[in-house]
Every structure is written in C-alpha cells, then in structure tokens.
Amino acid sequence: MGMPPLLFCWVSFVLPLFVAAGNCTDVYMHHEMISEGQPFPFNCTYPPVTNGAVNLTWHRTPSKSPISINRHVRIHQDQSWILFLPLALEDSGIYQCVIKDAHSCYRIAINLTVFRKHWCDSSNEESSINSSDEYQQWLPIGKSGSLTCHLYFPESCVLDSIKWYKGCEEIKVSKKFCPTGTKLLVNNIDVEDSGSYACSARLTHLGRIFTVRNYIAVNTKEVGSGGRIPNITYPKNNSIEVQLGSTLIVDCNITDTKENTNLRCWRVNNTLVDDYYNDFKRIQEGIETNLSLRNHILYTVNITFLEVKMEDYGHPFTCHAAVSAAYIILKRPAPDFRAYLIGGLMAFLLLAVSILYIYNTFKVDIVLWYRSTFHTAQAPDDEKLYDAYVLYPKYPRESQGHDVDTLVLKILPEVLEKQCGYKLFIFGRDEFPGQAVASVIDENIKLCRRLMVLVAPETSSFSFLKNLTEEQIAVYNALVQDGMKVILIELERVKDYSTMPESIQYIRQKHGAIQWDGDFTEQAQCAKTKFWKKVRYHMPPRRYPASPPVQLLGHTPRIPG
C-alpha cells in the first residue's frame, strides 16, 4: 500500500469538505500519523488564494489562540509552516490553518496522531502502524535502483549527516550499496534486498540539534524486457532559484525503452498538476515530446509557471515516470549584493551632490550661523590689531565721491564695527596726519587680517595707486608675501578691469568681487541683508561683542550746486 511522502503538507486531498463554516470555508482535513520524538513540519498552502497577499495563522482546536511565532518555542509557526521540535504524545489533536485575504477565508486542518514507536523494536505493538513517516518503495530485481529519503522542512531548518540503515544496521559504502545523501544506490538487486530500511538526518534549528527518521518498506519486483525502469536524467531532486512573479519553464528529461508505455507526468501533492491548478491554470504541464535514439527514447515533459508566487517556494514539484520520481524545489534568489552596493553608491553620490548643492547655495548663512553659535570671545594670537584694512578710491571735489565717503566713513563702520563688533582701519580716517601714503599702507596693512578694497569704474579714482609705485608694492606685498585674504567690493558694476592697476586686476582674478547695490536706505544698513552677509562671510570670525543697537544712519544724496 502506497505511503504519503514524509512531512509534506499537500500529499493528497484526503477529505474535501468545501462546507461553509461561519465566515470561513473548510477546504479539507489531512490525517498524519507520526512517531513521537520526531521533528515534524506541515506547510499550509491553498494555491487559489495563497498568493503572498494573505494573512495566515495556525491554532489548535478548540482553542482560538494562534500558535506562537516565536521560533524558540517547541511548537511554533514559521511563515506558512507549523513546526514541532520535536513531537510529543500530548500533541495529538486537530490543528487548523486559517488563510484570509481581502475577500475570502479558508480553513485547512490536520488530524495529527502521535504514537510511540521504538527504533528497531519489532516486538512493540505499535511498530506495525502504517505511519506517515513510513514509505513504500520498489527495487527492480537484476537491475540497479535507488531509494529516496524524503526530507521537506522550512528554510530555518538545516539538514545534514544523512545515514542509511537496513534493519538496525547502518549501511556503509560497498559494492552493493552506495549512500549519497538523500539517495541510496543499490546494485545487482535481488529478492534479499527487500525489507525494512530507514534514513536519518541531523536537523539543526537555532543551534538546537534533532534527529529526523524515515522508515521505508522495500519490495523487489521482476522486470523483464519492455519493463525497464525509466531513468529521469533531470531534475535531480534539486532546487532552482527564481524571482517572485517571474515565468519559469522546467523540463523533465526521461530515458525509457521503446516498448514501455509508462505514464510520464508532473505532480504536486500526489495530484496531477493540471488537476491541482484546474481553476487558474497558473501552473500547467506541457505537451510531451520524444526523440528516438538507438536503444531508448528520450522523453521530455515540462512544467510551466506562468507566474511564480510565494506559496511555490519550498514546495516540491515532482516528475513521475512509472516508479521513478524526481523533484524540484523553488527558492528565492540570494540577495544581489552588487545591486545593493550600486544602490548604496548612487544614494551616497546623490547625498553628496545634494549636500554640495545645499552648501554652495546656503554656505554664507551656514558659516555665519556656525560663527554665531560657536563663537569665542578670546582674541586670536596673531598679533593683529584690526580685522580689515579698508582701501577705497579718492574722488576729486565736486564729484560723486560723497556717496563713496558715506558708505566707507559712515555705513561701513555702522554695520561692521557697531553691529558686528569688528575693528577696521579705514584709509583716510585712521592714519595720523602727515604720514606718507606708502608708509600708512605698508605699516598698517600688516596689522590687519583682511584687506578690503573698494573699486569703481572710473580709473581716475585710483590714480593714487596707479601713479605711485610704492603704494602698489605695499598692496602687492600684502597679497603675495603675507598671504592676506582680500575682499573686493565694486561700488558699481565694473565691466573692464584692464584700465585698473595690476594689483586690483590680480585681486579680481583671484578672489572675485562683491557688488554694492547702491542702497542707502535704513533697511539696507542692517547686518542681515544679503550684501552685508557676503561681506561678513569673507571677514574673519568676530572676536569682540557688538556695540549696543543705535539708530541707523539716514542718507541725503548730494545735490549738485
């Protein structure tokens, strides 16, 4: 009598109920008889609805409390599986899996019977029970064949160290037997090779170790001419990595004799694929093809997954050819670390570009905020007396020099000295009477941290620099030898610097310029306006407290007389 595969949830539709019970539809009840002490899994899937967008819970009737999802608990839910690590006699009972989606609810039940079975104790009364972990397999007399150890567990369980037994004795590699993992190859089969076999495997789950056993009742069978057992060359009980939602076609290649009329097909849960997915045809068997060779025929029958869904993973799809069978198990691909790496680098690059853009756009405000938040009142130890040396054009009388004087001698000190706390040396205001121009520039510029130069389009306004070589040398020394930072302010937009002194051209080329907007209103005399923010940005960090607020200066434009 054929036995259902070990630990495999969709073995057969044992008891189709399809009776509405409350708000859920009972799909079927499956009967399992397992010996105590065994790890036991059961996978709950119902292809019409378990498409990844469902809520799935296990509970033991009559309790409505869900089975724990804590993987350290002996009985727990692992995704769609219920896992017993291991089974105990008191676990006998009915367990229900409830599958809900947005529009429907289904129940699948297992009637679990746990009994005591002693390993290699044939005298025990219960040892003759046909349990779910006992299989019946056939071997062909006079040929070579193989036995299969069926092990289906969730991915959280690691299986290794598979051993084979005949009776109670472990099978070692010999001319007769060749254990190869889940397969036991048997050569020169005769009647004496029938009997009781078993396979055991070590199961590791979260560091805990268990032993899984399958019991196999083997019968031998005479096969004459035309009765050769088909050989499935692919699949080989292997796994296939496939993306969720993709299309997949898998060929089953079978070699068989020309006289054999064996049925070749794909099954899932011991049901023909086309019958199992009759309503949706998402997974279907293809048309069989064959190729005649000298001594045999190569048959190919494929299975097509139009769309791979979550319930397909970890679920065996088996190709059958008479007594031969081989399965595939679909697995989700391992994470593509290259994609994560490229994505991470792209995100980092985007972040870096964004930070650079934000900094370049708001760097003036960022720097000024940082200075105001983390400022220090301690004077720098650089032996400098002034924060900036102000050099501006001298206009002849009866000219527009009144506006320049107002900016330099009134507004500039008002904003930078009184509001911001800087100390300025203004050429034309702070030198001692009778000092030579070259001496003033050369001596005092060395006591300043910045050089602030104001320029206007009129080249004649800089005649004091253009015609006096010593003054140009003093400014040039400050720029080149002392490495002083320069703030160049255009009183009006200067389109052509070619007529300017070489020192001014050098400053413009190396440091750029800030353009004064010509606004003399009281609002423009605030340190928080755009122009003054740019000036403060180029100034050194403020070292002195600002003066108390004073009334801002008004400006009366000069009326030509």
Swiss-Prot record:
It is found in: Membrane. Gene3D superfamilies: Immunoglobulins, Toll/interleukin-1 receptor homology (TIR) domain. Keywords: Disulfide bond, Glycoprotein, Hydrolase, Immunoglobulin domain, Membrane, NAD, Receptor, Repeat, Signal, Transmembrane, Transmembrane helix. Pfam families: Ig_2, TIR. It is an enzyme of class 3 (hydrolase). Its EC number is 3.2.2.6. The chain crosses the membrane at residues 339-358. It catalyses: NAD(+) + H2O = ADP-D-ribose + nicotinamide + H(+). Glycans are attached at residues 23, 43, 55, 111, 130, 231, 237, 253, 269, 290, 302. Residues 1-21 form the signal peptide. Residues 384-539 form the TIR domain. Residues 359-561 are cytoplasmic. SMART domains: IG (SM00409), IGc2 (SM00408), TIR (SM00255). One of its GO terms (cellular component) is cell surface. Disulfide bonds join 44-97, 149-199, 252-319. One of its GO terms (biological process) is positive regulation of interleukin-6 production. Its main location: membrane. Residues 22-338 are extracellular. Belongs to the interleukin-1 receptor family. Receptor for interleukin-36 (IL36A, IL36B and IL36G). After binding to interleukin-36 associates with the coreceptor IL1RAP to form the interleukin-36 receptor complex which mediates interleukin-36-dependent activation of NF-kappa-B, MAPK and other pathways. The IL-36 signaling system is thought to be present in epithelial barriers and to take part in local inflammatory response; it is similar to the IL-1 system. Seems to be involved in skin inflammatory response by induction of the IL-23/IL-17/IL-22 pathway. Receptor for the interleukin IL36G. This is Interleukin-1 receptor-like 2. It comes from Rattus norvegicus. The gene is Il1rl2.
